[in-house]
Amino acid sequence: MNEQFRQALSVIETLKRHGHEAYFVGGAVRDYLLQRPIGDIDIATSAHPQEVMAIFPRTVPVGIAHGTVMVIERGISYEVTTFRKEGRYEDYRRPKDVTFVRSLNEDLQRRDFTMNAIAMNEYGEIIDPFGGVEALKQRIIETVGDPAERFNEDALRMMRALRFVSQLGFSLSTETKQAIIRYGHLLQHIAVERIAVEFEKLLLGPFVSKAIALLVETNLFAYLPELATKKEELIKLSSYSLVPVDRIEAWARFAFVVHFHREQLKNWKLSNHLIRDILICLKALEHIRSLTDWTIDALYEYGPYIPHIERIRAAVYDDKPSVHSLLKQWEMLPIRNRKELAINGHDLLILFGKKGGPWLSEMIENIERAVLHRQVENEKEKLKEWAMCNQKRENNC
């Protein structure tokens, strides 16, 4: 048992002292067994939410209707959830009701995949009623019980399956894959925002190429926003070996390959801020196809986005990325954005004694370009002289 679990032991031990069962469950146990970095630690217990809140001094009822209470111990938050079973699902996405139970097995039985239905007690002993450990050894993603039932309960589980393929490099069991092929259309009942969360994780996984290939093989792509006609583009995307390093690069590379623009991205319900970043990368990639296309003007315009653009360019055009070299060139520019100019609009209004207007923005752009191309030093007095000279249209400015 590693240090993160040892820190959380006090929560388990406290619950047990009060006569309740308690176990580590979920992704943390799975990742511990895979010797991967562990995220948040979740605990399942026979104690009901009110009992949990009565036992611990610092709690937050984050999802009390579904049995979840946040317990804060030594400054660390743990989600403690009552053993439960779920009633009939509505709209292919959520149970109509949940019933608290006292059985760990019943709780594990409601989970999506066998690898996520493993529990661990305070001694580090594994409780695995559905063969999750063997699935981990075989590197297989399989549902708990009948995949048709699991996917009809919550259709988003099909996207989660492919997301785990991308993150872990596992394969789908034959039954799970066949069920995705058969029930993929149920994704149409799921909110785009929920799909986008899973799809983004898929795009960022180290085995994204494998997951994209499965997206095509299972025909699940046909039920994702704006992708029904993009089979060939997705096949092309699955051939790239470079793994995106962050969400901007992941979405921009995806959007570039499948020819998405603003409207298609908006239909994925992405934030305006993220869409802006993606569109900047797409604009650059329309012009920058080789290293020689990184002109001084391109470096200046896209500087902060160089790592994203260059890695996408290299992946798409089968080249080696030159991020470090380009960033050094960008850093050596006389200015890296307009705010670094030693003169501003107010200075120019005083200098020329004129009211603002189109002339002012044109003058600032001219000064900006002149400094960038080292036609004049970025010093206020020299810029004033250059501006006066430029205003008179003299050739020796």
UniProtKB/Swiss-Prot annotation:
Question: What protein name applies here?
Answer: CCA-adding enzyme
Kindly state the subunit structure of this protein: Homodimer.
**Family stated for the protein in its record:** Belongs to the tRNA nucleotidyltransferase/poly(A) polymerase family. Bacterial CCA-adding enzyme type 3 subfamily.
Q: Which Pfam families match?
A: PolyA_pol, PolyA_pol_RNAbd, tRNA_NucTran2_2
Kindly list the cofactors needed.
Answer: Mg(2+)
Positions with a binding annotation for CTP: G27, R30, R111, D154, R157, R160, R163
User: Which sites bind Mg(2+)?
Assistant: D40, D42
